[in-house]
Curated annotation (Swiss-Prot):
Post-translational modification note: Sumoylated with SUMO1 and SUMO2/3 and by UBC9. Sumoylation at Lys-236 inhibits enzymatic activity. Sumoylation at the C-terminal lysine cluster plays an essential role in nuclear trafficking.
Result, substituting R59A: Strongly reduces ATP-dependent activation of SUMO proteins
Consequence of changing R122G: In ACCES; loss of function; does not rescue the abnormal phenotype in a zebrafish disease model
GO cellular component, one term: cytoplasm
Protein name: SUMO-activating enzyme subunit 2
Location in chain, cross-link Glycyl lysine isopeptide (Lys-Gly) (interchain with G-Cter in SUMO1): K164, K236, K420
UniProt similarity note: Belongs to the ubiquitin-activating E1 family.
Record field: compositional bias (Acidic residues): 583-597, 631-640
Cross-link (Glycyl lysine isopeptide (Lys-Gly) (interchain with G-Cter in SUMO)): K190, K257, K271, K275, K611, K613, K617, K623
A single MF term (Gene Ontology): ATP binding
């Protein structure tokens, strides 16, 4: 029975008759879809580009083993209709960034709810909802931490009002089959440690994923591959740990299986390599027969500086380190007795040697630049697992905030943070007053404008298009023209129209210090004015930098005025917190679902938000604090 029967009549009618959009059918999306139909929502559009992976099954409860390889959106719809057949659900197996889903598409809905796992899609939906003037409920989880917030044009901050740290997210099949970044190999190496020496986890399998949907063009082929994988695993295979034990943890046999045989198997999945550079297997004997090489960083014409942990070695050295670490870990495991397990610790030298060597060997196989032990240690310590109960709590809060919006009580909406532990006031859920729009936001301001520092003699039009306009400012199909009185077109969204400009330097078009560019994305109904600040003093490997990010521009007086404006008429007397950085242990920023994206996730125990805490019993003065994101937390990862 739908809960709408207990709602006020007008709200119940809005719930039953209104059309809502859910973007994402993963960890949060499954819980949210279930909550919506049980609350009485009857007209739901659901969109997700992803397909179901085995690793999803432990928490994305609308999916079963038989669904592996199929569309998440379609299967979620089918599963929900089994227990609520009256619902009218439209499922799209597609990207929300497809131009078909334009402003008019978004205007069909009374409410949009995000259950996404990557920054680019979040930015895009944020802009589409602003353009369509449709309320958006944004959400995210990372481990035990979660967050829900409401975004409404002209009333609240938008998703991009304040810069966020780099998000890193990625699916399990990327880890096992098609790594493209060093962090993918580092995660794989940590999984391998647990498979060999620690507690085995089916979600941390390291062998090639034969059920990878990308390796099959048709869903039926993916399902057949999954069945073959399961049958083969049940009959012919034993666990990785049992196999390793049967070899006596022989380093050469382990090396051959992981870096030669498994890679050769990946190469048989030829569809994976049609648009990727294929991996190159390593042979133990060939590696050992190599002469002593210089360090990898020397090969890349970089000076060999710093401590030993900051040096990048050659393949032969990492192969030897791999062998030595296995021997040491085997002894440690034997000393603990039968049935014992080792726990990976980045401060354990042997465990760190193992992950460093295994990760670097895999990087070499997949044609990536290898990393130092120091870099790998910093990245390997920031991996966050997905937790089903966190997704469930956040999905419930999304619906509650949605009911407030449909009741016409958006002033009662809050940003709500879910904490790992109760705060000093014994609360796990901490509500915060919504902030008003940032007047300097380059997305939702009345006249979005930003300044970019770069070297006009070095930066190409292609860099401007891909790294600045698309990646940094999240445009999908930009048109860029120079404000030179002529309207010179620099970049066109029409394919091939300005391709000849790609490798030309900006200076070749008369762009210099003080030049202004107008970037338009007609899909997002978004225009951004870019001021060019020429500089020849950028740091090494820095192509550009955005000058004066929006949060840094907001002065104390502006912040105080904004705080007053949002508390006027509030029944609970919500006021900005006077808490110091050390006291705000209960307020956290979360920006990933449960996985890519990604990552990457944007959260840690040490991160704090600019939001204001609510406390019904205390009269707090209007003073805001902001905790700077710690640089070393940029690679916190949420895994799917």
């Amino acid at each position: 029975m739908a809960l709408s029967r207990g709602l006020p009549r007008e709200l119940a009618e809005a719930v039953a008759g209104g059309r809502v959009l859910v973007v994402g059918a993963g960890g949060i999306g499954c819980e949210l879809l279930k909550n919506l139909v049980l609350t009485g929502f009857s007209h739901i559009d659901l969109i997700d580009l992803d397909t179901i992976d085995v690793s999803n099954l432990n928490r994305q409860f609308l999916f079963q083993k038989k669904h592996v390889g199929r569309s998440k959106a379609q299967v979620a719809k089918e599963s929900v209709l089994q227990f609520y057949p009256k619902a009218n659900i439209v499922a799209y197996h597609d990207s929300i960034m497809n131009p078909d889903y334009n402003v008019e598409f978004f205007r069909q809905f009374i409410l949009v709810m995000n259950a996404l796992d990557n920054r680019a899609a979040r930015n895009h939906v944020n802009r589409m909802c602003l353009a369509a003037d449709v309320p958006l409920i944004e959400s995210g989880t990372a481990g035990y931490l979660g967050q829900v917030t409401t975004i409404k044009k002209g009333v609240t901050e938008c998703y991009e009002c304040h810069p966020k740290p780099t998000q890193r997210t990625f699916p399990g099949c990327t880890i096992r089959n098609t790594p493209s970044e060093p962090i993918h190999c580092i995660v794989w190496a940590k999984y391998l440690f647990n498979q060999l020496f620690g507690e085995e986890d089916a979600d941390q399998e390291v062998s090639p994923d034969r059920a990878d949907p990308e390796a099959a063009w048709e869903p039926t082929e993916a399902e057949a591959r999954a069945r073959a994988s399961n049958e083969d695993g049940d009959i012919k295979r034993i666990s990785t740990k049992e196999w390793a034990k049967s070899t006596g943890y022989d380093p050469v046999k382990l090396f051959t299986k992981l870096f030669k045989d498994d890679i050769r198997y990946l190469l048989t999945m030829d569809k994976l390599w049609r648009k990727r550079k294929p991996p190159v297997p390593l042979d133990w004997a060939e590696v050992q027969s190599q002469g002593e090489e210089t360090n990898a960083s020397d090969q890349q014409n970089e000076p060999q500086l710093g401590l030993k942990d900051q040096q990048v070695l050659d393949v032969k050295s990492y192969a030897r380190l791999f062998s030595k670490s296995i021997e040491t870990l085997r002894v440690h495991l034997a000393e603990k007795g039968d049935g014992a397990e080792l726990i990976w610790d980045k401060d354990d030298p042997s465990a760190m040697d193992f992950v460093t060597s295994a990760a670097n060997l895999r990087m070499h196989i997949f044609s990536m630049n290898m990393k130092s032990r120091f870099d790998i240690k910093s990245m390997a310590g920031n991996i966050i697992p997905a937790i089903a109960t966190t997704n469930a709590v956040i999905a419930g809060l999304i619906v509650l905030e949605g009911l407030k919006i449909l009741s016409g009580k958006i002033d009662q909406c809050r940003t709500i943070f879910l904490n790992k532990q109760p705060n000093p006031r014994k609360k796990l859920l901490v509500p915060c007053a919504l902030d008003p729009p940032n007047p300097n936001c380059y997305v939702c301001a009345s006249k979005p404008e930003v300044t970019v520092r770069l070297n006009v003699h070095k930066v190409t039009v292609l860099t401007l298009q891909d790294k600045i306009v698309k990646e940094k400012f999240a445009m999908v199909a930009p048109d860029v023209q120079i404000e030179d009185g002529k309207g010179t077109i620099l970049i066109s969204s029409e394919e091939g129209e300005t391709e000849a400009n790609n490798h030309k330097k900006l200076s070749e078009f008369g762009i210099r210090n003080g030049s202004r560019l107008q970037a338009d994305d007609f899909l997002q109904d978004y225009t951004l004015l870019i001021n060019i600040l020429h500089s020849e003093d950028l740091g090494k490997d820095v192509e550009f930098e955005v000058v004066g990010d929006a949060p840094e521009k907001v002065g104390p007086k502006q912040a105080e005025d904004a705080a007053k404006s949002i508390t006027n008429g509030s029944d609970d007397g919500a006021q900005p917190s006077t808490s110091t950085a050390q006291e705000q242990d209960d307020v956290l920023i979360v920006d990933s679902d449960e996985e890519d994206s990604s990552n990457n996730a944007d959260v840690s125990e040490e991160e704090r938000s600019r939001k204001r805490k609510l406390d019904e019993k205390e009269n707090l003065s209007a003073k805001r604090s902001r905790i700077e994101q710690k640089e070393e937390l940029d690679d916190v990862i949420a895994l799917d």
